[in-house]
Amino acid sequence: MTARTPAQPPTTGWRRMIARAPVQLYRWHLGPLLGRRICLLTHTGRTSGLPRQTALEVTGTDPATGAIHLASGFGPASQWYRNIQNTPKVTVQSGRRHWTGTARPMTPDESGRAMAAYAPLHPRTARTLMRICGLTTDGSTQDWYRIGHDHIPFVEITPDPRTQ
């Protein structure tokens, strides 16, 4: 059964510096060292209109379309998630691949299925994400589904045909 515990406060100081390190690695053209599991998402700020960047874990892929799935660990209040809802055109860099695409928030059912598929593949990362987000789980497939459905929205980014 999913339960909510007090979430950790937003990262500041040296923790923020560590959390933002992958973005800096991409800026130094060292992003491929992170592999394909961490991507750099460039999106447009909803109020400033300026480019914003965040490094996120690729939680899944759709080989048929080339789409990637990303999880908004801090829910729909995450700045990047709110920005892509306003302007869905994004740029993604994953490994050496650089492409433009369109972001689409997945439905709660799709998010639930994505979380239930992700958690068994990366159990330690999933448990760490739950702790950071202030959620607990019994580890069952149904509980992971419920977490994705109720708390962690996922996003699908489909490459533009001309950049594949």
For each predicted feature, which ranges?
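N-terminal short leaders/motifs
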Residues: 1-16, 40-50, 101-114
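Alpha-helical membrane-targeting segments
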Residues: 2-38, 124-150
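Covalent nucleotidyltransferase core used to form phosphodiester bonds in nucleic acids
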Residues: 29-31, 60, 68-82
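Short beta-strand segments
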Residues: 36-73
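Short acidic, glycine-rich loop/turn motifs
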Residues: 43-48, 92-94, 159-163
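Short strand-connecting beta-turns/loops that link adjacent beta-strands
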Residues: 63-65, 97, 162
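Short, structured beta-strand-loop surface elements
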Residues: 75-138, 142, 149-151
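A hydrophobic membrane-anchoring alpha-helix module
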Residues: 147, 152-164
